[in-house]
């Protein structure tokens, strides 16, 4: 299976850094995942990139996906989500998820 043109484009636009080590150790899985998540899923529906990323960030807050949130935040900013929108997503989540999840996301990483 080859990586689709759409998945390649999405990767280069939103994840321009070094590739995940999984591309070396399990390229078949990564192609399957990338073609699904970065082509089939993103090309369904009418959400633009910024709206999709805001929904993803909110979902990651809800499932306490802190590490993945940190990975996807720069991509969300590249997609056009503003820092003010990121803060608003966090603020809105506090009422539903509590403050513990919020405070862990705002701690500096070392």
Model-derived regions, located:
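Alpha-helical bundle segments that constitute or directly flank the non-heme di-iron/ferroxidase center
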Residues: 42, 63-64
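Internal helix-loop-helix
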Residues: 91-96
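Structural motif
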Residues: 45-52, 80-86
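Secretory/endomembrane lumenal or extracellular ectodomains immediately following the signal peptide
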Residues: 1-49
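Substrate/cofactor-recognition hotspot
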Residues: 68, 97-99
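Extended intrinsically disordered, low-complexity coil regions enriched in Ser, Thr, Gly, Ala
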Residues: 65-85
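Conserved small/polar residues in nucleotide/adenosyl-binding loops
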Residues: 103-109
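Short, structured motif recognition centered on aromatic/hydrophobic residues
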Residues: 51-60, 89-90
């Amino acid at each position: 299976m080859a990586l689709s043109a759409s998945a390649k484009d999405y990767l280069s636009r939103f994840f321009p850094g070094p590739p995940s080590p999984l591309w070396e150790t399990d390229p078949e899985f990564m192609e399957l995942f990338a073609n699904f998540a970065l082509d089939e899923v993103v090309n369904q529906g009418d959400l633009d990139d910024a709206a999709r990323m805001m929904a993803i960030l909110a979902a990651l807050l809800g499932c306490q996906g802190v590490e993945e949130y940190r990975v996807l935040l720069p991509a969300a900013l590249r997609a056009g989500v503003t820092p003010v929108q990121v803060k608003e997503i966090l603020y809105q989540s506090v009422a539903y998820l509590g403050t513990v999840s919020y405070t862990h996301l705002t701690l500096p990483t070392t």
